[in-house]
Amino acid sequence: SYDTGIPICRLLGGNPPDKIVYEWIQLKGMGPMSSSSGLTIGPMEALSLVPPEILRYVIARSKINRHIEFDTGSALFQTADEYERLVANPIRDEEEMTKRQLVAAETQRGAIRLSQVNPESDPSDSVGGVSFRHLSMLAQIKSSDGDVWSSLNRSGHIEGDPSDSLRGRLARMRSWIGGAHFPEDAKLEIRSEIGDDAR
């Protein structure tokens, strides 16, 4: 803990870091993450499910004195939608904004900036031209990555080969869909036969 580290830092001839107040990251509906209680999702597991920019956005958009509720289920779609909306429509016209709106706009810009893995990159590159929701649908109805890329080319979402960012997003999406955290109400089932109820 921080308090235990203070004397150790001084013993080793260093100064302890400044104390920063922060709250817990909680798994939605499960309470604070705790290795002793088994309520955890490790960073590598989280990164195998969620694009790093969206995972960073979950943290960057939160106030440091409030706990972060990390929902690996259906709310992840809403978080991704929010991130994609802010990236696609950056705030430009600030002349007629109130002071409160200006603060909110600056906070949103800061959250997007801190969400980027490479600070020099264009945030729109992280989306790859395809929304999180649309990619989840394609990942479920197309069995191969090549079929997904063909579909995206036909629909005009991409031209030619997909970006590395989009390839990574699809791999993570397939991992999320195949894992325990994907929401049941977002799962698609393709039937091979027409049932009697559909006739």
Regions found by a protein language model. Name each.
Residues 1-11:
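Glycine-rich, aromatic-lined ligand/substrate-binding cores of catalytic
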Residues 13-14, 67:
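A generic secondary-structure boundary signal that marks alpha-helix termini
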Residues 11-12, 27:
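Short acidic, glycine-rich loop/turn motifs
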Residues 15-19:
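Beta-sheet entry/capping signal
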Residues 12-13, 50:
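A broad structural signal for alpha-helix termini and local helix breaks/kinks
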Residues 2, 22-195:
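Catalytic adenosine-cofactor/nucleotide-binding cores of aminoacyl-tRNA synthetases and other
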